[in-house]
Amino acid sequence: MKKLTYGMVGGGPGSFIGDAHRKAINIDGKATMVAGCFSRSIDKCRETGAQLGVAEDRCYVSFEQMAKAEAERPDGIDFVVVVTPNVSHYPVCKAFLEAGIHVSCDKPLCLTVEQAEELEQLAEKKNLLFMVTYTYMGHVTAKHIKRFIAEGKLGKIRTVMAEYPQGWLAYEGEWGGKQGAWRCDPKQSGGVNCLGDLGTHVENAVATMTGLKVKRVLAKMDVVVPGRVLDDNDVVLVEYEGGATGCYWTSQFAIGHKNDLRVRIYGEKGSILWEQENCEKVTMIEYDGTEVVRYRGAPGIEPGAAAYGRLPSGHTEGWLESMGNLYRSFAECVEAKKNGVFTPDMIDFPTVHDGAEGVKFVHACLKSNEAGNVWVEL
């Protein structure tokens, strides 16, 4: 079978996330990168392209030029991967959708609710696939929880506690480097830092695992580190449709925490604990207090989730494999589209709709915070 081809916007010199996407796509070998606009500097773009084996004539000076040229080529790319700072997600994604090219975009989807709704509508109008890479939901154990809860095995959800603390931005100018600089810059991040970077992952993790839809939020967004202008610590109270409640905490100055996304879900029949830094296992407490631990690669994992496992139990799979799982499903759907056999039930990745829900969540939190920490409907 001929491999799919893709291009990348962003992901030039020093880009952590661009390199991660390329490695994740390579895990299953379903697509090859053949084009890119890796930097606003054409010299840096060509330098990166040469390092990655991309022909010079497919290293573009702008994303607009790339979208137009690739759409016109008989061998044009099948999809584009957008890994730029937040501020440019919307124009880049829009350009490729208008050119008829499937899109994978890093989160958050964009900066405003209006932009999110436009991208969602445009993808639907053009009949194009659009993935937003909430990477952690590619973990086998996260997929297990989603299926376990959907089958009613936890009963009605009563409350959710979720947190995502990091400590890498505990001091202004320390550790962050290039990655911290743009996140803390309102012009590049869109006026929100911690909540847009970490809070969107929390919102998506809970929504994906539980199926709960946020009804309203009450948020307190703090700016704590001296010299910083955007939030670096957030606490959000959540009420879901149906009456369940939740509490989310995200922080970038929580010294001692690295990438500590955790979700605790409490239902009528028991509870579930999932930890991103210990993502090989799921801990479940049954109604009578019995603790049941399920491990990726071992018996007890829901079959649809277990199918994404690559290695025997005890051979650790992690973050790159999780993103690779998202790209496995995305590539299979793109291939099915090309062959005229695609059906919506094939989708097993976060879509533009999920990305739009994340943007709406962030903006409701902003409104709540600005109004003095009051309840705001989504």
Residue ranges and their predicted role:
Residues 1-3, 70, 81, 329-378:
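C-terminal helix-rich "cap/oligomerization" subdomain common to oxidoreductases
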Residues 1-54:
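N-terminal Rossmann-like dinucleotide-binding module
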Residues 38, 82, 105, 162:
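Redox-cofactor binding/interface segments in oxidoreductases and associated redox assembly factors
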Residues 58-77:
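A structured beta-alpha segment of the ubiquitous adenosine-cofactor-binding alpha/beta core
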Residues 79, 85-137, 152:
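Beta-strand-loop-alpha-helix segment that lines the small-molecule cofactor/substrate pocket
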Residues 129, 136-228, 236, 282, ...:
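Predominantly a Rossmann-like dinucleotide-binding segment in NAD(P)-dependent oxidoreductases
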Residues 198-271, 275-280:
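Glycine-rich, aromatic-lined ligand/substrate-binding cores of catalytic
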Residues 235, 240, 269-349, 353:
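C-terminal glycine/acidic-rich active-site capping loop/insertion
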